[in-house]
Amino acid sequence: GELGEALENLSGKIFVELDYADLAGWRAWVDYPVHLPKGRGALRVWGDLDKGAGKVTADVALEELRIRLGRKLPELELASMRGRLEGDYKADHWAVAGQQVELLTQDGLRIAPTDFKVDWHQDAKTATVNGNSSASFLDLAALGRLASYLPLDTHSRELLLRHRPQGRISELRASWVLDGENLTRYSLKAGFQELGIEADHYFPGASGVSGN
């Protein structure tokens, strides 16, 4: 039978440790959840699989990555990526987390080591997505520069590009409901330092604001 079908029915524990791996070369055998035409480096992967569901953890030290996080998004080119990644998935629920994840893009943008978690559940009948996310630290200027590469809803991406936020966010907690491409409900809690937002039409903008 097809390898993909076999993997969907695979159950058991996995452990893989490689000093060097060509991730793009594995595409013939592994169905990555994102488009990954290039990438190499060291990794250690372990976890449990249960017939199309599972929990997997990976320690990675990768270089020269090209990755696309959505079908309509451009490829993000990374010089390096390091940290621990965790994935927990079922038919209607996904969770992705990272510990001390740091990135360096090919054009020199550096993302400092960050802990984060994103999980979402899709209703089988309505296809509505309920999501939650958290992050220990976010550099808003860096996030704005990466906005066009991230799987954000159209409104959020436009706001980032239009207002060009600056500053640092700490202890972020967010939740949302997504119906198709429409963000129908959200909540947000975070601390912020030296927050700045560019003015636009009736929005006055701000700079140097700190608080919660």
What positions do the PLM features span?
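Short amphipathic alpha-helices and their capping/turn segments at secondary-structure boundaries
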Residues: W120-D123
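Extended amphipathic, helix-rich lipid-handling scaffolds
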Residues: G1-T105, T126-Y202
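Polar/acidic, low-complexity leader/linker segments enriched in S/T/G and N/D
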Residues: A112-F116
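Extended, hydrophobic alpha-helical segments in both membrane/secreted and soluble proteins
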Residues: G208-N212
